[in-house]
Amino acid sequence: MAAKIIDGKTIAQQVRSEVAQKVQARVAAGLRAPGLAVVLVGSNPASQIYVASKRKACEEVGFVSRSYDLPETTSEAELLELIDTLNADNTIDGILVQLPLPAGIDNVKVLERIAPDKDVDGFHPYNVGRLCQRAPRLRPCTPRGIVTLLERYNIDTFGLNAVVIGASNIVGRPMSMELLLAGCTTTVTHRFTKDLRRHVEHADLLIVAVGKPGFIPGEWIKEGAIVIDVGINRLENGKVVGDVVFEDAAARASYITPVPGGVGPMTVATLIENTLQACVEYHDPQGK
């Protein structure tokens, strides 16, 4: 079986085009364009690349993008003060603080300081709690982006045995909640899981997010499984690969995401969706 490639680039562009049309309609109706504040502390090269892609995406869909590039020496108190200012700014619908933060700054304290109605990354305990209670509002971007991919490819997830490899707060844990909403029987594996291969071999839907190149061999994949590879790993030769051995897995799967060009573009597209949602649902005069 040769797997069908799930083209995240194309779907992400569709999502961004849909958002752009809605923004144009808002502005034509006399409403303001949504605003996103992107905060970067320090000069981590990978973070700078991620932030640049998010800013570019904002501008392409017609958002107001405001950048805050702070030095590595920024204190936690200074960062929290900036977040307080942005929370009170009526022209800003979403606040994104790029992780990781420098040593000495508490990630949890910073993320919890962002107002839940401006938490477009979906990391605030309020938004994670809403997802757990089956009443989601602003949803974590990567898991929601994966669900969008499955929906756009008309993949029926109800009744599937889904296995998530990795239990991070950013992907694994919220992904398990999204899969429950999508009707899956869901297993989350982690570093203490015994006999990982057995879990993988029984997965109708496999989502891998561990950040280790080639972590899941292709021969572990169940025939006809749907494989979603969240990993983005750069090898010494410069090649970017996922957590799954792609060629071998693609020979057994029914659908598979490539790396790059699979899940990654959907994370940014969902951030854009979340920002528009925050603007419309929370911050418009007629919003809830």
From Swiss-Prot:
Record has Transport as a keyword: no
Binding residues annotated for NADP(+), in chain numbering: 166-168, 232
One Gene Ontology term of the molecular function aspect: methylenetetrahydrofolate dehydrogenase (NADP+) activity
Amino-acid biosynthesis among keywords: yes
CDD domains in UniProt: NAD_bind_m-THF_DH_Cyclohyd
PROSITE patterns: THF_DHG_CYH_1, THF_DHG_CYH_2
InterPro entries per the UniProt record, alphabetical: Aminoacid_DH-like_N_sf, NAD(P)-bd_dom_sf, THF_DH/CycHdrlase, THF_DH/CycHdrlase_cat_dom, THF_DH/CycHdrlase_CS, THF_DH/CycHdrlase_NAD-bd_dom
Family affiliation: Belongs to the tetrahydrofolate dehydrogenase/cyclohydrolase family.
The name this protein goes by in its record: Bifunctional protein FolD
The species this protein was found in: Citrobacter koseri (strain ATCC BAA-895 / CDC 4225-83 / SGSC4696)
